Amino acid sequence: MAQAFVNSKIQPGKVVVFIKPTCPFCRKTQELLSQLPFKEGLLEFVDITATSDTNEIQDYLQQLTGARTVPRVFIGKECIGGCTDLESMHKRGELLTRLQQIGALK
């Protein structure tokens, strides 16, 4: 169930962030990404606490990415890590480049 749920969310050309709403790093990630000019429907925040499978989802994220912490940020099918990784990419100018490469920005 958790594996199918996660896999259904991760898609090429889209940015998906698995979050918990009470997590300060998740909120920071949401703030950063929400400031960028995404095309409609190509940025999705998935609240993993809204399901009864929160632990299973985190276990599968661990299998998939090497970490079960949130946020887990996927650009297309690739996990780039969490909040700190996203901020580093943004500071280096790599984030906008990657988002343009997958066609996610207006």
Curated annotation (Swiss-Prot):
<dbReference type="GO" id="GO:0005737">
    <property type="term" value="C:cytoplasm"/>
</dbReference>
<keyword id="KW-0963">Cytoplasm</keyword>
<feature type="domain" description="Glutaredoxin">
    <location>
        <begin position="3"/>
        <end position="106"/>
    </location>
</feature>
<dbReference type="InterPro" id="IPR011767">
    <property type="entry name" value="GLR_AS"/>
</dbReference>
<comment type="function">
    <text>Has a glutathione-disulfide oxidoreductase activity in the presence of NADPH and glutathione reductase. Reduces low molecular weight disulfides and proteins.</text>
</comment>
<comment type="similarity">
    <text>Belongs to the glutaredoxin family.</text>
</comment>
<dbReference type="InterPro" id="IPR014025">
    <property type="entry name" value="Glutaredoxin_subgr"/>
</dbReference>
<keyword id="KW-1015">Disulfide bond</keyword>
<dbReference type="InterPro" id="IPR036249">
    <property type="entry name" value="Thioredoxin-like_sf"/>
</dbReference>
<keyword id="KW-0813">Transport</keyword>
<keyword id="KW-0249">Electron transport</keyword>
<dbReference type="InterPro" id="IPR047185">
    <property type="entry name" value="GLRX1"/>
</dbReference>
<feature type="disulfide bond" description="Redox-active">
    <location>
        <begin position="23"/>
        <end position="26"/>
    </location>
</feature>
<dbReference type="GO" id="GO:0015038">
    <property type="term" value="F:glutathione disulfide oxidoreductase activity"/>
</dbReference>
<keyword id="KW-0676">Redox-active center</keyword>
<keyword id="KW-0007">Acetylation</keyword>
<dbReference type="InterPro" id="IPR011899">
    <property type="entry name" value="Glutaredoxin_euk/vir"/>
</dbReference>
<feature type="modified residue" description="N-acetylalanine">
    <location>
        <position position="2"/>
    </location>
</feature>
<dbReference type="Pfam" id="PF00462">
    <property type="entry name" value="Glutaredoxin"/>
</dbReference>
<feature type="disulfide bond">
    <location>
        <begin position="79"/>
        <end position="83"/>
    </location>
</feature>
<protein>
    <recommendedName>
        <fullName>Glutaredoxin-1</fullName>
    </recommendedName>
</protein>
<dbReference type="InterPro" id="IPR002109">
    <property type="entry name" value="Glutaredoxin"/>
</dbReference>
<feature type="modified residue" description="N6-succinyllysine">
    <location>
        <position position="9"/>
    </location>
</feature>
